């Protein structure tokens, strides 16, 4: 490859040299016809010859650089040197799932329904979360109890519709529905992502400690 580039560049230089030589000869012939232009023509020829030598030197330098780049693969070496540099840099990734990074207290993960410390359900069936949900993923049915309070008989969330905007958690006046810290809830079937009230309460019981701590740490900003 380098020899081909060198040969092409040499042929180009020869052709340019012949053209400039022809122009120089034509200029010298005209100078002979002019009695007073001999010295001017010779000076011009000297300048053209000097310019030609500079261009030839420059072109040979270009040919030499191209040959070196082709023979020694300098671009590849430059890329490999960059790879080698980052190879010894400190790692910025973790070995998931054996290692896990920290989560923000505002992280919005799997949904959960919370209880009071007495075990009573927090949800009062106001349906604000159902009304505010932009994806219409929440379905609530409720009935009135003997003591006059309202509690849900059905609380479903279609997790395949949920966009994890957190509006349900923001709208809830009693912190009943929350998005917990769990993000590992992938399933193999669609039906497993249709959460009912029992599933949501189970999530709340499992993650209550983390959820309560996150809510306390963010209480000044809510």
UniProtKB/Swiss-Prot annotation:
Cofactor(s) named in the record: [4Fe-4S] cluster
Alphabetized PROSITE patterns for the sequence: 4FE4S_FER_1 (PS00198), 4FE4S_FER_2 (PS51379)
Key words of the record: 4Fe-4S, Electron transport, Iron, Iron-sulfur, Metal-binding, Mitochondrion, NAD, Oxidoreductase, Repeat, Respiratory chain, Transit peptide, Translocase, Transport, Ubiquinone
An example Gene Ontology molecular-function term: 4 iron, 4 sulfur cluster binding
Binding site for [4Fe-4S] cluster 1: 123, 126, 129, 172
Chain positions recorded as [4Fe-4S] cluster 2 binding sites: 133, 162, 165, 168
Main subcellular location: mitochondrion
Domain called 4Fe-4S ferredoxin-type: residue spans: 114-143, 153-182
Pfam families with a match to the protein in the record: Fer4_7
Reactions it catalyzes: a ubiquinone + NADH + 5 H(+)(in) = a ubiquinol + NAD(+) + 4 H(+)(out)
Entry-linked InterPro entries: 4Fe4S_Fe-S-bd (IPR017896), 4Fe4S_Fe_S_CS (IPR017900), NADH_quinone_OxRdtase_chainI (IPR010226)
Key word Ribosomal protein present: no
GO cellular component: membrane; mitochondrion
EC number per UniProt: 7.1.1.2
Keyword Chloroplast included in the entry's annotation: no
Cofactor note (record): Binds 2 [4Fe-4S] clusters per subunit.
Subcellular location: Mitochondrion
Quaternary structure and interacting proteins, as annotated: Complex I is composed of at least 49 different subunits. This is a component of the iron-sulfur (IP) fragment of the enzyme.
Family stated for the protein in its record: Belongs to the complex I 23 kDa subunit family.
PANTHER family attached to this UniProt entry: NADH DEHYDROGENASE [UBIQUINONE] IRON-SULFUR PROTEIN 8, MITOCHONDRIAL, NADH DEHYDROGENASE UBIQUINONE IRON-SULFUR PROTEIN 8, MITOCHONDRIAL
Annotated function: Core subunit of the mitochondrial membrane respiratory chain NADH dehydrogenase (Complex I) that is believed to belong to the minimal assembly required for catalysis. Complex I functions in the transfer of electrons from NADH to the respiratory chain. The immediate electron acceptor for the enzyme is believed to be ubiquinone. May donate electrons to ubiquinone.
Protein's name according to its UniProt entry: NADH dehydrogenase [ubiquinone] iron-sulfur protein 8-A, mitochondrial
